[in-house]
């Protein structure tokens, strides 16, 4: 059968939302008990509508992308139907504690997020969480709502980070509403459907350690090992092995952040994933003009979470996790006394934490070597990379474009230097460095074209710059969601040229320098 231009093909039937709802099931975390979670329905969100949707995240969950058009989709993924769910099936908020800006903050918890269950697909299970679904027992002074602005930023950055190859939570959808909420100004509400294999944070362990609840602490550790670190079960000390794996993943994650110029903004221990995922997208930012001291969070007046500080803070956060796990480390070994076990546990934990620099450093060096197009490893490579970063810092050269344009530099002469050279104020400094770089490239067997292709596979052309997100947000506030979709599509192919979208890779406009992001959302 064929259709003429004047005839429309019959529309495919929309997915059955009831089937999706039926597939949701209680996840293993809530089975840990009432000490871990509180069940409650989401707060009603009036007249919800779809702002953004990720086909890719839907497929990861085994869902049809056409689900977004199914009747009731926006209602379900803002949590409205949960008011009618039986008590035993209600969503839940989890409790945790943590250090915020280096200070013990005590009990925190999911103050505006509810986990509605999990979906299984391709041998993996994914938890679905609604961020902005209303007040919980852990909301403190908050209203439990997320705003459209921050929800769009989280949705877009979740997509961007995933397609950059950086471990991250995902975002299935953003649901908006005209319901007003008060922040620094009047804004409107939104809910993000976040997806991850687990939302367990360092702060979950800190909570039960600080409250002297060893049984719950052990149950939590056993849950994480059983579900996500099964190899740790066979280790001589499973809990020490858990610390080692979480520390390694954290070190490697932050190395990936540094390699793309990503600043998280709020690296509190309650924002650190036990799985080594980027989690809790708040006042984040990708660096434009490079500044190693760059602080993306306007609320971070002391610069604790500056770009250059992220590795040190991640290491410190792992110490906090280690402290929380100390009561468990060594339980599988015979010890003459509890004091002896505890003393040995401290020694073993310090040994694990001492490996962080040797995990982070080589991971970052490998990433930077690839960004420079160096297939061979040479003793002076780290110094060459550091010299580049120093002159980038001095000239405030654009981070993303500098590395992307380096692919045009030839090992033979300076004819390809102009695009990257023009990013530097001190061009003599760049010329001196470029001569060193060319000399290093002469030791490589690859020709310029092969090297450039390899570099363009690791140096993105497109990242989520703040002004791009701001443009999409401004249009979304006028009920035009096309820019959210367009920008998300570009960010799903960050390494491709996409010449029709060159404007998204351009240097930021002057007005972008006035943008500020903070913890206000």
From Swiss-Prot:
Binding, ATP: 109, 111-112, 131, 143-144, 194, 201, 280
UniProt keyword Nucleotide-binding present: yes
UniProt-listed Pfam families: SelO
Cofactor: Mg(2+); Mn(2+)
Keywords recorded for this protein, A-Z: ATP-binding, Magnesium, Manganese, Metal-binding, Nucleotide-binding, Nucleotidyltransferase, Transferase
Alphabetical list of InterPro entries matching this protein: SelO (IPR003846)
Positions contributing to Mg(2+) binding: 271, 280
E.C. number(s) listed in UniProt: 2.7.7.-, 2.7.7.108
Active-site residues (renumbered): 270 (proton acceptor)
GO MF annotations in UniProt: AMPylase activity; ATP binding; magnesium ion binding
Recorded catalytic activity of this chain's protein: L-seryl-[protein] + ATP = 3-O-(5'-adenylyl)-L-seryl-[protein] + diphosphate; L-threonyl-[protein] + ATP = 3-O-(5'-adenylyl)-L-threonyl-[protein] + diphosphate; L-tyrosyl-[protein] + ATP = O-(5'-adenylyl)-L-tyrosyl-[protein] + diphosphate; L-histidyl-[protein] + UTP = N(tele)-(5'-uridylyl)-L-histidyl-[protein] + diphosphate
PANTHER family associated with the record: PROTEIN ADENYLYLTRANSFERASE SELO, MITOCHONDRIAL (PTHR32057:SF14)
Family per record: Belongs to the SELO family.
Role: Nucleotidyltransferase involved in the post-translational modification of proteins. It can catalyze the addition of adenosine monophosphate (AMP) or uridine monophosphate (UMP) to a protein, resulting in modifications known as AMPylation and UMPylation.
Protein name in the entry: Protein nucleotidyltransferase YdiU
Organism: Burkholderia mallei (strain ATCC 23344)
Native organism taxonomy: Bacteria, Pseudomonadati, Pseudomonadota, Betaproteobacteria, Burkholderiales
């Amino acid at each position: 059968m064929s259709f003429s231009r004047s005839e429309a093909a019959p529309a495919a039937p929309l997915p059955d939302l009831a089937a999706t709802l039926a597939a949701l099931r209680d996840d293993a975390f809530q089975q840990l008990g009432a000490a871990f979670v509180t069940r409650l329905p989401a707060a009603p969100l009036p007249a919800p509508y779809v702002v953004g949707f990720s086909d890719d995240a839907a497929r990861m969950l085994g869902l049809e992308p056409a689900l977004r058009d199914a009747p009731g989709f926006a209602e379900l993924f803002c949590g409205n139907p949960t008011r009618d769910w039986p008590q035993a099936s209600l969503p839940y908020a989890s409790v945790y504690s943590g250090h915020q800006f280096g200070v013990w903050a005590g009990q925190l918890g999911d103050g505006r997020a509810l986990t509605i269950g999990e979906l299984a697909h391709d041998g993996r299970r994914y938890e679905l969480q609604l961020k902005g679904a209303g007040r919980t027992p852990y909301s403190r002074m908050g209203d439990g709502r997320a705003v459209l602005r921050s929800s769009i930023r989280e949705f877009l950055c979740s997509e961007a980070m995933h397609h950059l190859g950086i471990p991250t939570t995902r975002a299935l959808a953003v649901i908006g509403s005209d319901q007003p909420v008060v922040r620094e100004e009047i804004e409107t509400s939104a809910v993000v459907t976040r997806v991850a294999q687990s939302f367990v944070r360092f702060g979950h362990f800190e909570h039960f350690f600080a409250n002297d609840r060893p049984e719950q602490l052990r149950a939590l550790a056993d849950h994480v090992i059983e579900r996500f670190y099964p190899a740790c079960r066979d280790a001589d000390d499973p809990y020490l092995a858990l610390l080692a794996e979480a520390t390694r993943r954290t070190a490697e994650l932050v190395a990936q952040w540094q390699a793309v110029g990503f600043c998280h903004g709020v690296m509190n221990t309650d924002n650190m994933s036990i799985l080594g995922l980027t989690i809790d997208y708040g006042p984040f930012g990708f660096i434009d003009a490079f500044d190693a001291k760059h602080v993306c969070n306007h609320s971070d007046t002391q610069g604790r979470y500056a770009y250059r500080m992220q590795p040190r803070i991640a290491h410190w956060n792992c110490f906090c996790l280690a402290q929380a796990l100390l009561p468990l480390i060594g339980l599988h070994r015979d010890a003459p006394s509890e004091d002896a076990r505890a003393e040995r546990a401290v020694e073993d934990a310090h040994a694990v934490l001492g490996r962080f620099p040797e995990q982070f450093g080589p991971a970052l060096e490998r990433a930077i070597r690839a960004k420079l197009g160096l297939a061979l490893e040479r003793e002076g490579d780290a110094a060459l990379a550091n010299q580049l970063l120093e002159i980038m810092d001095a000239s405030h050269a654009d981070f993303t474009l500098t590395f992307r344009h380096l692919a045009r530099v030839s090992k033979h002469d300076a004819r390809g230097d102009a695009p990257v050279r023009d990013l530097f104020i001190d061009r003599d400094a760049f010329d001196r460095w470029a001569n060193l770089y060319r000399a290093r490239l002469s030791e490589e067997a690859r020709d310029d074209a092969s090297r450039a292709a390899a570099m363009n596979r690791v140096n993105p052309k497109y990242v989520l710059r703040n002004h791009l997100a701001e443009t999409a947000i401004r249009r979304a506030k006028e009920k035009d969601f096309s820019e959210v979709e367009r920008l998300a599509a570009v960010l799903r192919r960050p390494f491709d040229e996409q010449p029709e979208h060159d404007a998204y890779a351009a240097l930021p406009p002057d007005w972008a320098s006035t943008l500020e992001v903070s913890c206000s959302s």
